[in-house]
Amino acid sequence: MPKYYIWASDPHGTGQPWIDLVKEAQEKYPDSETIFGGDYIDGNKFSLETVKFVYDQVKFHQASALAGNHEQLMYEFVEHNNDLWYINGAKSTIKSFFGRGYSKRVAQEKLRSNPYYIFLINLPIVIETPKFIFVHAGITPETNTNHQRRLNDKTYATYFNLWARNEYFYSNIKNKIFAHNLTGKTIISGHTPTGLISGRYDNGQAGFDVTYTGEQNEFACPIRKIQYPNEPARYLTDNGCHGIRSHYGNVCVFNSRSAKLIEVFNND
């Protein structure tokens, strides 16, 4: 077991600035395993550079990587002609991968034989260690044991792992009451920019508010921790790279034994 886990998720084509944060964390914490949390594509201009880095880290540096919902959108477009990807960043990703835009049919053909596409669609959905569950969006206690599922799986568990937002954060969505973590393990996720998340606890414990008011183009997306007494924490980490160009990600370092957050690398 490594002494530390480095978690880096949701770069959305940020490229070198995000890569530099990951390398900075790796240099400071050499006794670590890096786990990438998905959503490497769409949004910014450098999807190919971002995916190449993740690919090389997995193939040659003992890192692990998860798929995110944007990788699933790409998969559904290529394999099932689902155009939803095209309103979520497909054009910038296709241009990054191939140097120019293509018709949908040609893009499908080119992606289907692309080694980085093949790499992405075969990534796992959940990674579990003795102390942690790493997942792109969220987990429920009854769906945290099957690590064989991939993007072609159509179960609710896979949907939840890739897409869940409020149904993961809250037990009472209307009143934004945080759910308990009943898994017995610390859960690390990305997917939702943390500045959009707020809530409170069911025991009177103070919660936290959103940093986005609906008016500003940029807003803070710090690490958020949800934790009830005598339960493991849930860490929310998405730095908002998909929509906030000045953000380069939250790269987090966790102690593998205590499951505590040690340090965050970002450009905030």
Regions found by a protein language model. Give the residues of each.
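Short acidic-glycine loop/turn motifs at beta-strand connectors
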Residues: 129-130, 253-260
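Active-site neighborhood of divalent metal-dependent phosphoester bond hydrolases
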Residues: 43-130
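Active-site neighborhood of phospho(di)ester-bond hydrolases with catalytic His/Asp-centered motifs
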Residues: 8-9, 34-38, 64-69, 135, ...
